[in-house]
Each structure stands twice: as C-alpha cells, then as structure tokens.
C-alpha cells in the first residue's frame, strides 16, 4: 500500500481553465498506479486533493491560486434562516445512504441533470461510462445519498467517508425539483450525517471567488480554507 512519502505525482500540460475564462490551468495527479486506501485518501484530502473516480488531483497552476480547498467544521455549523427553510421545505423527503454503484435508475437521473443543467459544460454529453468512471470507479468507502419523494428518486449525492470527515463529491437532482434547493438540502443532510458519525468535517471541494456557481459554499459557516498549508476560518469581509 502506498503512503505519502512514496507517492509520485504528475502534472498535466497547461490547458484552458474550466472555471475562469481566459486562464490556463495545470492539474497535479497522484500516480494512477498508486494503491490509495482510506487512510491515505484522508491524508490527501486534508492536503487539498479531491477524488474523481480513481484519480486524485489538485490544482497546480503556476501563476494562479484561485482554487481554494474548503471544509466545514460540522459541530460549529448553525443553519441560517434560508437553510432552515430548505430543511422544512424538504421534510417530506426520505434520505438513505447506499453503497456507490451503477444502476440505470441512477444514470437516468444523472443524464437528465447534465443535459438540462450543464449542457454547456465539459461533462456534456453524459454517458454511462462517464458516470461510472466519475462516481463509481476508485471508490474506497464511497456512498450514494438517495433523496426520495415517496418512491421517486429526485436527488443523488456521491459522498466519501474519510477518517475525520465526509467528502461531498457531486450532487445531481431532478431538474423539475429545482425549487426544492436539493443541492443545499444534500449538503445540510451530509452535515447532519457527519455529526451523527462523530466526524469533524465536511469537505466541499474548491471555492473560487470569481466563479459565481461556487458562491453557495460560503453560505455554510464557519467555513475553513486551506491557505499556505494551513486550514483557517475564511474571512468573509
């Protein structure tokens, strides 16, 4: 089994940034031949890495540090008025955690979400292979949060369990349920689940000040950012 001392990393060639127009980005990847167990994955996450399928990566741009890893210390979180409304609005839904896997039911929801919400992104068009390589392959202690309206699957969130927290990987929802704010609801549920499991953190990936679609992450307070190798509460002013 690999460890931090023996890991080999690779950097991609510069490519167009997916988040900030006109910028070039470089990504650092863990050697895909490395054997990454839950303990090593947890260490990598605390250093700002993310998982996408069987790949572990973090931004490694020469002249830009806009991508900031963020996490929430769940025991300090108190929902604001808007988040309490989201919880109340979705109190009729059922949530359950199941082992991450491919099913046509999951893929149907995923494909509708990508086609109707992200047709201008690099995940379009969706495919079964894409779903599997992104959300199922490489899983260590990986789960899907099913969000159900009676028997209808209306939301699906990929969640990894780490040594000290949960990592929110990706969430999709039924486009016709947009008014339910299921993305926010999924995060609120994961916060509650982390508390129930007596875990300290919910990792929310990267926050980019110039990317409006990531603004929602800073609505969960107090949020911590990894800067200069140290996690610290993010100053919102």
Question: Positions of the model-derived regions?
Answer:
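Conserved donor-binding loop and adjoining core beta-sheet/short helix segment
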Residues: 2-34, 39-50, 54-74, 149, ...
């Amino acid at each position: 089994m690999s460890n931090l001392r023996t890991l080999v990393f690779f950097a991609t060639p510069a490519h167009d940034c997916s988040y900030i127009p006109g910028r070039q980005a470089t990504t650092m990847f863990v050697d895909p031949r490395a054997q990454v167990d839950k303990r090593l994955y947890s260490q990598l996450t605390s250093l700002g890495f993310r998982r996408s399928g069987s790949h572990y990566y973090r931004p490694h741009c020469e002249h830009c540090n806009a991508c900031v890893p963020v996490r929430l210390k769940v025991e300090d979180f108190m929902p604001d008025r808007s988040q309490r409304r989201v919880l109340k609005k979705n109190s009729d839904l059922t949530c359950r955690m199941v082992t991450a896997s491919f099913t046509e039911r999951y893929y149907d929801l995923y494909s509708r979400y990508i086609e109707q919400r992200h047709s201008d992104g690099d995940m379009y068009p969706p495919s079964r292979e894409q779903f599997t390589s992104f959300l199922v392959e490489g899983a260590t202690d990986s789960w899907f949060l099913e969000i159900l309206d009676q028997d209808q699957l209306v939301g699906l969130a990929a969640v990894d369990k780490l040594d000290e927290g949960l990592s929110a990987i990706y969430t999709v929802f039924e486009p016709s349920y947009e008014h339910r704010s299921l993305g926010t609801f999924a995060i609120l549920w994961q916060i509650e689940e982390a508390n129930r499991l007596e875990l300290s953190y919910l990792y929310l990936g990267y926050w980019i000040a110039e990317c409006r679609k990531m603004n929602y992450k800073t609505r969960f307070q107090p949020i911590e950012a990894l800067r200069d190798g140290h996690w610290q509460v993010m100053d919102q002013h």
